[in-house]
From Swiss-Prot:
The PPIase activity resides only in the second parvulin domain. The N-terminal region and the C-terminal tail are necessary and sufficient for the chaperone activity of SurA. The PPIase activity is dispensable for SurA to function as a chaperone. The N-terminal region and the C-terminal tail are also required for porin recognition. It is found in: Periplasm. It comes from Vibrio vulnificus (strain CMCP6). Residues 1-19 form the signal peptide. Keywords: Chaperone, Isomerase, Periplasm, Repeat, Rotamase, Signal. NCBIfam families: PRK10770.1. PROSITE patterns: PPIC_PPIASE_2. The keyword Signal applies. This is Chaperone SurA. It is an enzyme of class 5 (isomerase).
Length: 428
């Protein structure tokens, strides 16, 4: 089944894309302040049966199938209502991007996609609006479920260690080593201070092999401290214990053993995938709509802030401290610090990824409220050291997200007013 056909099936199950003419005014289910029409259920049933016939898939009997469809419609309606409640809006730009991606994934142009949808009896305008609705529901679900997820640092560390062992098995490191050896009667704190001084010089660019020739008492001192290429399993244990996916050029130490203090340098790495990310330092002002402050009022107030900043009447930081309703950043002149854009909700992420440095955005809305944001700086950061922790976090997040989605949907359903209207009530 093409991707758009899968979406079309969801559309028929969630929104009366094609409605049977006589059934339009027949309410089948009341869901809070919304309704599901019998025509929605009938259309979804016909579509599912037709697709099952084409694919040779067996379906349950009519009563069970009807119950499953009604349950799906109720959950989808509740998710749409949640999106409306927290103010999720999908603008035309994001909608167009999503539909272009659907067309690309099906190797179609937009015109070809539109024609294919029309051949199934659905207008392109209806298709667009249903995709918009499903995007909003998905975004609301993600935002609300994300708040319920708690991942402990120990969970991340434990999984990252397992992943690291699997990945590190084939990685080879070229290691440089400097050993400062204990001698009888020597002040160990003085030796440690010397080791720290050497590390500072190395980090400032001093040549490692020269330092090893000069100071090291280790077994490879006459080779400039060069131990050559080794996998972790081939290294001395005191080396292997310090190697945790660091990248080329990393200086490690000083660390202590029974014979003295050690300094390592990873001269080169083979087989380790490096990870570079862009971090953005931005600042923002957040206003949250209330019964007193409307959406339009929040926009007007933020536009007035922009005018005052440009006129030199106030600084961004002053206004953030005085007015922003994000207490964590307001105290820092609105600054959020260097973060990867993926940490932010989609609308905020889009702004910090696309705004030129030093430019203040127009007011925009997220699930948190109305914002203006300014990008202060961008930087490329090598995250190879933390790549395994990031991967471990994503795995744990996805596991817990899938578990929490089910629980959230059950709670949503349990807390809703749902009334299934029988034939007698409709006829009476």
């Amino acid at each position: 089944m093409n991707i758009w056909k899968t979406l079309l099936l969801g559309m028929l199950v969630t929104g009366s894309a094609v409605s049977a003419p006589v059934e339009l005014d027949k309410v089948a289910v009341i869901v809070n302040d919304g309704v599901i029409l019998q025509s929605d259920i009938d259309t979804a049933t016909k579509t599912l049966r037709a697709n099952a016939k084409k694919s040779g898939q067996a379906l349950p009997d009519a009563d069970v199938l009807n119950e499953q469809i009604v349950d799906k419609l109720i959950i989808d309606t509740l998710q749409t209502q949640e999106a409306d409640r927290i103010g999720v809006r999908i603008d035309d730009t994001r909608l167009n991007q999503a539909i272009e991606e659907i067309a690309r994934n099906n190797n179609q142009t937009i015109d070809e996609l539109s024609a294919a949808i029309a051949s199934e009896g659905v207008s392109y305008a209806e298709f667009r609006e249903q995709i918009r609705k499903e995007m909003a529901a998905s975004e609301a679900r993600n935002a609300l479920v994300r708040r319920r997820i708690n991942i402990l640092p120990a969970e991340v560390d434990n999984l990252a260690e397992l992943l690291s062992k699997e990945t590190n098995a084939s990685v080879e490191y070229r290691i440089g080593h400097i050993q400062l050896r204990f001698t009888d009667g020597q002040d160990k704190s003085a030796l440690e201070a010397q080791a720290k001084e050497l590390v500072e010089k190395l980090k400032q660019g001093a040549d490692f092999s020269t330092m090893a020739y000069t100071y090291s008492k280790g077994p490879k001192a006459l080779q400039g401290g060069d131990w050559g290429w080794m996998r972790k399993e081939e290294m001395p244990t005191i080396f292997a214990d310090q190697i945790k996916m660091q990248n080329k050029g990393s200086i490690i130490g000083p660390f202590r053993s029974g014979v003295g203090f050690h300094i390592l340098k990873i001269e080169d790495v083979k087989g380790l995938e490096t990870v570079a990310v862009t971090e953005v330092n931005a600042r923002h002002i957040l206003l949250k709509p209330t019964v007193i402050l409307s959406d339009e009022g929040a926009q007007r107030e933020l536009n007035e802030f922009i005018r005052r900043i440009r006129a030199g009447e106030a600084t961004f930081g002053e206004l953030a401290q005085q007015y922003s309703q994000d207490p964590g950043s307001a105290a820092q002149d609105g600054e959020l610090g260097y973060q990867t854009p993926d940490l932010y909700v989609p609308e905020f992420k889009h702004q910090v990824e696309t705004l030129p440095v030093g430019t203040i955005s127009e007011p925009f809305k997220t699930v948190h409220g109305w914002h203006i944001v300014e990008v202060l700086d961008r930087r490329e950061v090598d995250r190879t050291d933390s790549a395994m922790k990031n991967k471990a976090y994503r795995i744990l997040f996805n596991r817990k997200f899938n578990e929490e989605v089910g629980a959230w949907m059950q709670e949503l359903r349990a807390g809703a007013f749902v009334e299934i209207i029988n034939e007698e009530e409709n006829d009476g």
